[in-house]
Amino acid sequence: MSKLILAINAGSSSLKFQLIRMPEEELVTKGLVERIGLKDSIFTIEVNGEKVKTVQDIKDHVEAVDIMLDAFKAHNIINDINDIDGTGHRVVHGGEKFPESVAITDEVEKEIEELSELAPLHNPANLMGIRAFRKLLPNIPHVAIFDTAFHQTMPEKAYLYSLPYHYYKDYGIRKYGFHGTSHKFVSQRAAEMLDKPIEDLRIISCHIGNGASIAAIDGGKSIDTSMGFTPLAGVTMGTRSGNIDPALIPFIMEKTGKTAEQVLEILNKESGLLGLSGTSSDLRDLSEEAESGKARSQMALDVFASKIHKYIGSYAARMHGVDVIVFTAGIGENSVEIRAKVLEGLEFMGVYWDPKKNENLLRGKEGFINYPHSPVKVVVIPTDEESMIARDVMTFGGLK
């Protein structure tokens, strides 16, 4: 019996949704509500491949969900709201409390709220979505899917910072990692494509978009990842610095007269590719600029690729080798150039890749870019976090 599952990603003023038929993983419709709580909110829904857009004031997330459900009925996507069997909600931070997805109860809601200090920009917004759906669809399972959960299998030696140990015990200061739902999806898909049990594979997953993280996945479990206590750590990103020497923060404060909050804002929003190039956080713009001879744009691309390259070497060492390297997310799926730069010189590790295959894989295409004889396989997999969310609703919502 097929089930209709809603995969939800709620922001403070937005609500992204996908309605998925399970277990077929067939997309029924998707859409977005923008500018919730502001004038002229925008509601967009896909009907028969066409986007239908309406502009109206939407005061809060409850009203946004109401409008979405009405649109489902108006466009004959469902006959009745009881046709929806479950909802899955992306929650950015599950701390140490949630090592896997969980059916939402009042108690779980309270715990997600308590974890808001670890993700003050995201968890409160995710909760708004959860509360709206629980209010309007009270009789179906609602499941929380945490970005951090997949990385809860990391050993202490990977997640502890070399700080006074009581900081970890008292304040929860440790590496948590993010993009877990994506890393989990592509690692499972890589095993399927190779027709091998995931338990037998050492996978390095490169989720490279405007935000980027690398994960070492040994036997299907995350044993290390590049993001840390927050998504600011790790590799260079669109506007985020990635790892820097922590002593730079007081140094920059002293030199510029800025507060710690202002420096943090710069590290999050004015650094990375944007900071290095001085022109854009968008890799496509920088590639064009580099081609036309802009040295700084080229330098930004080189730094960006070099950091990812370094993590691949590091994680291969952590797992005593690697069987598969996966590229996913906006840049990982579409940038022929970045994949080439990242893979350059990895032959010593058994990575032999085919430039022609690399050039052919973009715009949502899936496939291998290694030569057949390459001991290490290299694969491009478009991520599908929504399908992963829907799978977890089936499992943890008791719908299987």
Curated annotation (Swiss-Prot):
Q: Which cofactor does it need?
A: Mg(2+); Mn(2+)
Membrane-traversing stretches:
none
User: What does the Swiss-Prot or TrEMBL cofactor note state?
Assistant: Mg(2+). Can also accept Mn(2+).
Class of the enzyme per the UniProt entry, highest EC level: transferase
Residues annotated as the enzyme's active site: 147
User: What's a single GO CC term here?
Assistant: cytoplasm
- Asked if the keyword Kinase belongs to this entry, the reply reads yes
Sites annotated Transition state stabilizer = 179, 240
EC nos: 2.7.2.1
* Protein origin, superkingdom: Bacteria
Query: Pathway it belongs to?
Result: Metabolic intermediate biosynthesis; acetyl-CoA biosynthesis; acetyl-CoA from acetate: step 1/2
Catalytic activity, reaction form: acetate + ATP = acetyl phosphate + ADP
Q: Which CDD domains does the annotation name?
A: ASKHA_NBD_AcK_PK (cd24010)
Q: Where does ATP bind?
A: 16, 207-211, 282-284, 330-334
Explain the purpose of this protein.
Catalyzes the formation of acetyl phosphate from acetate and ATP. Can also catalyze the reverse reaction.
Q: Which HAMAP family match?
A: Acetate_kinase
> What is this protein's name?
Acetate kinase
What organism is recorded for this protein?
A: Staphylococcus aureus (strain NCTC 8325 / PS 47)
Cite the source lineage: Bacteria, Bacillati, Bacillota, Bacilli, Bacillales
